[in-house]
Structures are given as structure tokens and as C-alpha cells.
A protein has these predicted regions:
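Sec-dependent N-terminal signal peptides
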Residues: 5-13
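C-terminal motif of bacterial Sec signal peptides marking the signal peptidase cleavage site
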Residues: 16-17
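C-terminal, non-catalytic "cap/extension" segments appended to globular domains
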Residues: 21-47, 54, 261, 367, ...
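N-terminal helix-rich structural modules
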Residues: 22-216
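Short His/Asp/Glu-rich catalytic/ion-coordination signatures at enzyme active sites or charged loops
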Residues: 32-47, 96-115, 139-180, 240-280, ...
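Active-site-proximal, well-structured secondary-structure segments within enzyme catalytic domains
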Residues: 155, 187, 194, 199-240, ...
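Active-site recognition of the HExxH zinc-binding catalytic motif
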Residues: 480-495
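Conserved small/polar residues in nucleotide/adenosyl-binding loops
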Residues: 510-515
Length: 516
């Protein structure tokens, strides 16, 4: 009787523990938030790993159910079931992998390194599962007789090809080697990216003399002074490798040695023979990618990647680039000669170098067209440009974007908009994250926190690296940055306006060279 009571008590404790974990870990159930947005205010570092583990267990069980199904394989009970097999992984992965790019920390990076081999193994366990592939192949073999819609045909084709490209047809010994390669590549890629991010963050060009700021616009000086003040360097100016700092510095700084220092620091990221050096990592990645491609029947990795794109092979790509090169190279040489003439007028006997290009291009624009980019920027206040992009979307598609307050975000810079169609129905939720910071990768991109699927509306984000407002000076965009905002918003519209029945055919799941 005593033992029975102990067992009952233990079982009760286990049930309570599981219930408590489910209640406290927001990833383990559908998000209980307006519009199902991620509850960033409740998500903690310790939630990710158990959620990934639970997601793996859940998908394994769902896949086993597909395999154990005694009915004849069909599009619904195999392809659709597989497409819907990972709700928890989709939830936690949608947040985790976005934040490792937009708001990472040392702890998040370490966790990413820890999880990468496990997730790579899980992916291989699915792709190399022979019983599952037999069912996928059985459906694929009768594709022409199934009366599928174009979208269903696309999902079936993508699913089957993914298994083939992942090694489902390889013999056991080659599959084992492929697993090891994928495991190594999963961590090498993270290390490479993290080293670049570290190099971006580690480089700090402090300027202590005002004469060394010659040529720099006043707004840029104020921004650099605010950056220095934030690091405890009062009375100095701080310039970094983030686009919003590096590019204006190269464009306006009259101090050639400092331009050279800035340019070389950027170009040599991962090439400084220090803890962030990427040379061996690059060599390992190239070697493993080549071996992987050859295992899968391709002569090189580029042909393996391009086989899944519109271009199809590296020959087509090189033909395109070589044709472009025949026109671009003479033009570039003519522009370089023009810039060199401008340098020669200064009588310093200097030869045009890469770190001179932006600076003398700006001077040439002034001399040739009486136009300076600084004269244009006041017309491109960030908020005005964004509203312009929203207005274009309204004119083209009838949608409206309204700012939402009180929605959880992962950083104070992030803003959230609700997107509605002309009839008032919801199109999706749109996040914007426009300014650089130490935990954020450089560049600009669009991504999803949730894919559109049937009646499920997408959660889409744009992440950029525009100049932050300083004091009373708003964020003013260059022409290139205006183009970037519209470009990334175009990708966001693709994600928001997607109307697909299946997750596997939704916005981000098209060929990479069709994207831009």
C-alpha cells in the first residue's frame, strides 16, 4: 500500500511538473496573445532548448504515425501530414532563428552552437528515413493520376526532391558520411557568422581631434559623439563597421589614412589571425561542401545548390556573369579614370584605392552635377519614406497598415503594424526593426515569425541598419537606403499577401534566385 501511494504521488508530481512546464514555457502551446504574435515579454533563454526537444519528439511521433498508417499512401495522409508535422518546432524556430540574427547574445549564440548538431541530426533522421521516403515516393510515382492542383503538384514535387537532394537514395555507408558532414557544417556556419559579428562589434575607431573629422556632415558628427558617449568616451567620436557608420565615413571623411583603416577593417573581418579568424573555417566548409555535393552526384557544390534554382547550373550563371562583365568592366574602368583625374587635381600624387572610391564619387557628383547627397536626405526622413511605401502598397493592393501599441517586441526599436485588406479583413502583422546595434547582423532582410497557411495569417518582419535619430535630428535616408526600404518592403508584401493552402508552398519557400 505504501509503495502504491508513493507511485501515485510520483505520478502526480510528474503530471504537475509537465503541466507547470507547459504553462510556463510559451512555446509549448499556441501563443496566447493578440493575433498569435510571439510573447517576447515572456520568452526566456531557458525556454528554447526544452521547446526544441519537445518539438523534435512531436514531429517524430507525427512522422511515425504517417509510417504506421495502413491505408494506401495519398497526398493527404503523407505529403500534407508531413507538411503539418512540426507545429512546435515552427513556433520555437520562428523566434529563435530570427533572434540569432536580429538580437543575439553570447548565451543565445552558445545555445545555437549546442542545438545545431541535434537539429541537423533530426533533419537527417527525417530525410534519410527509408520507410517515410517509400511513402513519399509512392505518392510521387502516381502524381499525374492524382488530379492535383498546381499548388499541390508544387508541394509534392518540392517534398520528393528534398528527400532526393538530402540523400534518401544513397547507400547506408554514404548516408552515414552525409550525416557527419551535415553535423559539422551546422556548427561551422554558425561559427563563421558569429566571428563576422564579433569583428563588426570589436572594431571601434575613436577620433579625438576635431580636425580629423574634416568633411563629415554635422549630423554624422553628432551621431558619432553620441556613440562615443554611450561607451564612456566623452568628448570623442566613435565610428564602427556597421553600414550606418562605415558608409558615410568612407563617403565624406577627408582623412585618407582613417578611410583606409576603416575600409581594411571591414574587408579583413575574419582574416586577422585572431580568435575570430575564419580562414580555416572557410577551408573546412569548402571541403565538406564539395564532399557533400559529390556524394549526392554533383561535380561541385555550386551545381548542387543551383540544381534547386531557376538557373539550374553554374554554367548558366557564369555565362550570365561573363556577359554582364563585358559591359560592366569597361564602364568601371572609365569611372575609375574619372576619379583618378579628380585626385590628380589635388596634386598629391596619390593613386586611386578602394577606400577612395566613395569619397571621390561624392566629390565628382558635386563637380559634375552640382548635387550633394546631403542636400537630398532631408526629403527622405525615415518615417516619411515608410509612409510612402505604405501608400504605394495601398494604391497597388488596397491594403492599409496601422501601428499597434502594446504588442510584445524583442527590442524597443521594433515597431508593429497590423495589415488589413480593403474589406477590413486582416492580411497579417508586420514588424519593422530599422536601426543597427551590437547584437544584430549587418545588412537588411525580410523574414517570417509565422508562415501563411490557409486561414493562418503571416507574421512578417523587415530588419535593416539605417542611421538612428540623434537628439532632434531624425533618421534621414540616403537614396540607397530608400531603395533598401522599398526593396525589403517588397519582400514583406510577398510574405503578407501570400495566399497558399500549405505551409510548404508559402512565401519563403520559392527558389532563391526568384526572390530578387
Amino acid at each position: 500500500m505504501f509503495k502504491k501511494c508513493i507511485l501515485i504521488l510520483a505520478a502526480s508530481c510528474m503530471m504537475y511538473s509537465c503541466a507547470t512546464q507547459t504553462e510556463s514555457n510559451p512555446f509549448l502551446t499556441e501563443f496566447q496573445t493578440p493575433n498569435g504574435v510571439p510573447p517576447f515579454d515572456k520568452i526566456k533563454l531557458e525556454h528554447y532548448e526544452p521547446a526544441f526537444q519537445k518539438g523534435i519528439e512531436e514531429q517524430n511521433a507525427n512522422i511515425q504515425a504517417i509510417i504506421d498508417n495502413t491505408e494506401a499512401p495519398t497526398f493527404e495522409n503523407v505529403i500534407v501530414a508531413l507538411d503539418n508535422s512540426s507545429p512546435t518546432l515552427d513556433r520555437v524556430g520562428g523566434v529563435f532563428f530570427n533572434l540569432t540574427e536580429a538580437e543575439t547574445t553570447d548565451e543565445l549564440t552558445a545555445l545555437s552552437m549546442k542545438l545545431a548538431p541535434t537539429l541537423a541530426e533530426h533533419e537527417d533522421n527525417i530525410s534519410l528515413n527509408q520507410e517515410l521516403f517509400k511513402k513519399v515516393d509512392a505518392v510521387y510515382s502516381q502524381k499525374d493520376a492524382l488530379g492535383l492542383t498546381r499548388e499541390q503538384q508544387r508541394l509534392l514535387e518540392k517534398t520528393h526532391k528534398k528527400f532526393i537532394r538530402s540523400g534518401a537514395n544513397l547507400p547506408a555507408d554514404k548516408q552515414a558520411r552525409l550525416r557527419e558532414i551535415n553535423k559539422q557544417l551546422s556548427t561551422l556556419g554558425i561559427t563563421f557568422s558569429n566571428n563576422i559579428l564579433n569583428e563588426n562589434n570589436d572594431f571601434k575607431l575613436y577620433v579625438g581631434k576635431e580636425e580629423d573629422l574634416a568633411g563629415l556632415p554635422q549630423w554624422f558628427r553628432e551621431s558619432a559623439m553620441a556613440e562615443a558617449r554611450a561607451t564612456g568616451q566623452e568628448g570623442k567620436w566613435l565610428f564602427t563597421l556597421h553600414n550606418a557608420s562605415r558608409l558615410p565615413f568612407l563617403q565624406y571623411s577627408a582623412n585618407r589614412p582613417l578611410r583606409e583603416q576603416m575600409y581594411k577593417a571591414y574587408i579583413n573581418r575574419g582574416n586577422n589571425n585572431d580568435k575570430n579568424d575564419n580562414k580555416k573555417i572557410i577551408a573546412d566548409i569548402v571541403r565538406l561542401r564539395l564532399e557533400k555535393a559529390q556524394l549526392l552526384g554533383f561535380d561541385c557544390y555550386s551545381n548542387f545548390v543551383l540544381d534547386n534554382t531557376m538557373a539550374k547550373n553554374s554554367t548558366a550563371v557564369m555565362d550570365f556573369l561573363n556577359n554582364l562583365w563585358s559591359y560592366a568592366l569597361p564602364k568601371a574602368k572609365a569611372e575609375a579614370a574619372e576619379l583618378q583625374k579628380l585626385m590628380d587635381k589635388e596634386g598629391k600624387g596619390e593613386k586611386l584605392e578602394a577606400w577612395d572610391w566613395w569619397y571621390y564619387t561624392e566629390k565628382l557628383r558635386k563637380e559634375k552635377y552640382n548635387l550633394e547627397e546631403e542636400e537630398i536626405k532631408p526629403y527622405f526622413k525615415l518615417e516619411n519614406v515608410r509612409e510612402g511605401a505604405f501608400a504605394v502598397a495601398n494604391k497597388l493592393y488596397g491594403i492599409t497598415l496601422t501601428k499597434l501599441e502594446g504588442i510584445p517586441v524583442y527590442h524597443p526599436d521594433v515597431e508593429v503594424f497590423e495589415v488589413k485588406a480593403a474589406d477590413g479583413s486582416q492580411v497579417g502583422i508586420f514588424y519593422v526593426d530599422y536601426f543597427p546595434r551590437p547584437g544584430k547582423s549587418g545588412g537588411a532582410w525580410m523574414s517570417n515569425y509565422r508562415e501563411q497557411q490557409g486561414s493562418i495569417r503571416p507574421l512578417v518582419c523587415n530588419v535593416c541598419s539605417f542611421t538612428k535619430p540623434v537628439g532632434d535630428t531624425p533618421s534621414l535616408l540616403t537614396i540607397d537606403e530608400v531603395e533598401t526600404l522599398f526593396h525589403e518592403f517588397g519582400h514583406a508584401l510577398h510574405g503578407l499577401l501570400t495566399q497558399c493552402q500549405y505551409k510548404g508552398t508559402s512565401c519563403l519557400l520559392y527558389t532563391s534566385d526568384a526572390a530578387d
